[in-house]
Structures are given as C-alpha cells and as structure tokens.
Amino acid sequence: MKKNYRIAVLSGDGIGPEVMQEACKILNVLKKYFFLSLEIQKFNIGGIAIEREGVALPKTTLLGCENSDSILLGSVGGKKWDNLPVEQRPERAALLPLRKHFNLFSNLRPAKLYPELKCLSPLRSDIVKNGFDILCVRELTGGIYFGEPKGFVNKNNTKYAFDTEIYHEYEIIRIAHLAFKLARSRKKKVCSIDKSNVLQSSILWREVVESVSKKYPDVHLSHLYIDNAAMQIIKDPNQFDVLLCSNLFGDIISDECATITGSIGMLPSASFNEKNFGLYEPAGGSAPDIEGKNIANPIAQILSLSMLVRYGMNLNQIADKIDKAVNNVLKKGYRTSDISHDNNFLKTDEMGDLIVDSLINGE
C-alpha cells in the first residue's frame, strides 16, 4: 500500500449517505487502530450533484476521482429525477460515464450466504444448510451491450431489431487472467459460463479461457452452458467458487446469485481497470422508499470498503478482519430490518456501531 492512500468518497443519493456514514466509521477505525495513512475526500454525484452543481457527474468530482487511488461509491438515482430526459438521469449521466472514463472492464460481485442467514434464501434449507460463497467475475465493456451494428428498423410495414455480440481475444484474455488470479486466493476453482454450442463468440470465449488456464495449473477450470449454469446455481450453489462470465451472461447470473442470498443489502461489488484502479459500491440501488428512515442495511457498503482494502490496498489481513467483524455481529443474532423476521431489528447506525466495536475488539 502507498504511504498515503487517497479515497474518493461519493455518497450519492437515497440511502447512500446513510450507509456511507457507517463505512466512514470503519475508515476512521482503520486510521486510528490500524495506523493506515488514508486521505478521504468527499464529492457529489448523481441526483444530489444535479441539485448542487447542475450535472450528475461534475468536473470537480471527476477530477477528484482521477487524483484518488480508489473510489468508494454509495448509490445514485431516485424517483425525484425520473422527470428528466433519460440521458440526464443520475444512473445514466453519472455511473456510465464514470465507468467509461476509467475504462473499468471487469465487475466482481460476491454472493455469500452466511449459515446464520440461510432462512432468508428462497432455496430449500437442505440446499443452503452450509451457506455458499460465490464470486461472479463479469466482463464489463464488450459483448452484445456494446457491439456494433445495432438498430431498430421499421420498413415496409415490418419491424425488426438487431444487436451484435462481439468479443475480441484481448478482452477475454484480460478478464480470464483476473478470474484465475482471484481463484488462487479462494478455493482454486473457476467455472466459465458460455453458450459455445450455439454462439461463435462463445466458441472463441471457451478457446481463449482454455488457453489462459494453462498458466494457472493450480486452478481447476470447468465449463457450463449458461442455461445449465442457471440450473446448477439453484440446485447446488455450494459447488461453485469463481464464475467467469461475459457481459450479458454475467449480468444475468450475478443477479441470480444475489437473489438466492436473500438480501441484496448484504452484497458488495467492485469494478477494475487494467491498472487495478477500482470503483467499489453496494450491489443494490438507492432505495428511495426507505431514505432517511435509518433502517437501511449498511453491510453491503461496509463490505464494499472491505473489497477496497483487499484489492485496492492489498491488505488481505485487514480486509479479513472487517469481514470477520461483520460475521461476528451476524452470529450474535443482530439484524437490520431487511434480514429480520420480526420487529426486533437494529437501525442503520446501530448496526454500524456494532461492526465497529467488533472490528476494534476482535470479537
């Protein structure tokens, strides 16, 4: 880690400021008790930036992010900006340009079900009795979402539309290397998801992944067609470690994995470029319906910070301690409203304080 690590904090909209406040408590612990030299700078993004600075992604925010080592993001968007043209809404005008500006080609979505929370999963109890821990590694800049040509045609009283799935070899190589490197620090298993029995792009995908795998003989590689993968995740999620996916398939599979954990309020995510610059954010949205009620689950934001510490700072032991602090609080039965089956639940700040105490005291 650098002597002085700079983090751009973008709280954003909805519950973003509330959950970010709890993550900032963890940052303060890292400075005071773990003696990390951290420089925290806060900037506007999303709807709040529109209100304060006139645009969803102000130049000051972009410059601040450029001068940082990592970005910690809350959430953007909400119903109050739905009256704006689509291209000016916070989600479109802030997140997409931010990801594009930093060439974030990969997205990591952990989907972990703690045994203590297995009752939340929609899957049968015998399937999730031991929990599961899956990491979805999704290619973020190629594939059918960005392939050209694409279009919508209304001609001779007939309508048709078309999209193009394109993958370049280098795009597959770099995402495959990332997946295998991540697997080395986990259970050393990569399952690559494709549709190579139908799609030419998937034939290349499988061919390239196989080639890259030879450089990681200690990691076991398997392949599944996307339809079978969707079934297997429901049937036995614990069989998986790292899932390597194209843009489209990763979009679908990561949401499926998130759903079977029972609460998206528990799930962090990270996106990287080739220089390992990262954007870390909760997998969920801005949840404007519970904004200001102090009932949002801050765990996804705190675990996003843990990912920043692990992958951005390369401080695995400290990240492990943050993860353990969250786990310890859950083991003791503490819950926020989204993961509680009764009215006996903690407020956002109370959950944050308990995790802070657990991190400081190691219990």
UniProtKB/Swiss-Prot annotation:
Residues the UniProt record annotates as site (Important for catalysis): 145, 195
Molecular function terms from GO: 3-isopropylmalate dehydrogenase activity; magnesium ion binding; NAD binding
Binding positions for Mg(2+) per the UniProt entry: 227, 251, 255
Binding site for substrate: 99, 109, 138, 227
Protein name from the UniProt record: 3-isopropylmalate dehydrogenase
Pathway the protein contributes to: Amino-acid biosynthesis; L-leucine biosynthesis; L-leucine from 3-methyl-2-oxobutanoate: step 3/4
Subunit structure: Homodimer.
